[in-house]
Amino acid sequence: MILLGVNIDHVATLRQARYRDEEETFGGFIEPDPAEMAWVAEEAGADGITMHVREDRRHVQVEDVKRYQEKMKTRLNLEISMSLEMVQIAQEIQPESVCLVPENRKEVTTEGGLDVRGNIERAHEVVRELTQNGIPVSMFIDPDPDQLEASAEIGAPWVELHTGSFARAWYNPEKRDLELNTLREGMRIGVELGLRVNAGHGINYENVEGAKTLESIYEFNIGHSIISRSLRTGLAESVQKMRSLLNE
């Protein structure tokens, strides 16, 4: 069975759109609460929760993560950059796993995979430090053979393949098949290297039909489409629907 990790970042995005200048990020009239929505997602069948604490704190705050941990029922996958500050925060929070991602302050969302090869010394240092503190680390990368090999070289136990190009190409059959084959080859190489392979970015209720055909996929991390659907159907139904699609 393919596992479903639910990314809750955009619950925090909605809150910050209205209350980012408040001294507190929760309580009283400040809503929605990312921690509460994460608990709802767990009750609805999520196998894990992903939260991305960015350096610019544009959505999820450290306090959101800590509050979620108070009552969490599954596991926390914390997305962070490789900065010294964020690595220290990860060690303080002690999530069940960390996923290292690139960050660009001008981007709306993560635009591509981490360049592990081009930052291999720092990536190796971060993986070693977090692993020594009992936190397994994955690398959010494009399905590029060199990036997969670099991830294996530094001792990352798994990777998350960036599916954004596939998601954008879904409505163009020629491009869709090309991107799906690229992901499939990335999956094959990852497995040969002994990596566990997750995937995510841009997966929705339509293109998941193609994405789930990837052999050996362990887990999808999905956020925006689930949160978007929840505005119509509620978060519990949105998680349950995605869970059922993965199980078909």
Question: Where are the predicted features?
Answer:
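Catalytic cores of alpha/beta
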Residues: 84-93, 144-154, 199, 203-217
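Glycine-rich, proline-tolerant flexible connector loops at the mouths of alpha/beta enzymes
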Residues: 47-67, 72, 102-115, 163-174, ...
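C-terminal helical cap(s) of enzyme catalytic domains, especially alpha/beta-barrels
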Residues: 171-176, 229-248
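Conserved N-terminal beta1-alpha1 strand-loop-helix module at the mouth
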Residues: 1-77, 91-95, 178
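Hydrophobic faces of well-ordered beta-strands that scaffold small-molecule active sites
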Residues: 2-8, 49-51, 76-80, 96-100, ...
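Glycine-rich phosphate-binding active-site loops on the catalytic face of alpha/beta enzymes
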Residues: 99-107, 158-170, 215-235
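Alpha-helix-loop-beta-strand connector modules within alpha/beta enzyme cores
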Residues: 58-84, 118-138, 175-199, 242-247
